[in-house]
Amino acid sequence: MARIAGVNIPTNKRVEIALRYIHGIGPSFSKEICEKVGVEPSRRVNQLTDAEVIKIREAIDAGYMVEGDLRRDTSMNIKRLMDLGCYRGLRHRKKLPVRGQRTHTNARTRKGPAKPIAGKKK
């Protein structure tokens, strides 16, 4: 198994698919990385040489924010909004939808499981 950006990449998959196992790399980034390094996207990971794996690893480290750095940056951005006290920050703080979705019904994913209310029998 090749290890890139702290993630074990599956060896039996194509390179462009296997790179998507890294948090922060999607379809377009994986194709871009393959182009930049000069690796054919349809090749399998187990067919790559050690030099090619090192090139891919260096390309990802040099140009992309992935895995822990990306997660940390995202959480710091949310924390900054909460500290500012802006509308989006308040919505994050109250664990409600941030982007204008309705909350009267729905929003169960964001709000969590429904809390039973006493005296609501019919």
UniProtKB/Swiss-Prot annotation:
A biological-process GO annotation: translation
Keyword terms, alphabetized: Ribonucleoprotein, Ribosomal protein, RNA-binding, rRNA-binding, tRNA-binding
GO cellular component terms listed in the entry, alphabetical order: cytosol; small ribosomal subunit
UniProt cross-references to InterPro entries, sorted A to Z: Rbsml_uS13_C, Ribosomal_uS13, Ribosomal_uS13-like_H2TH, Ribosomal_uS13_bac-type, Ribosomal_uS13_CS
Disulfide bonds, paired cysteine numbers: none
Family (UniProt): Belongs to the universal ribosomal protein uS13 family.
Protein name (Swiss-Prot/TrEMBL): Small ribosomal subunit protein uS13
Source organism: Hyphomonas neptunium (strain ATCC 15444)
Recorded name of the encoding gene: rpsM
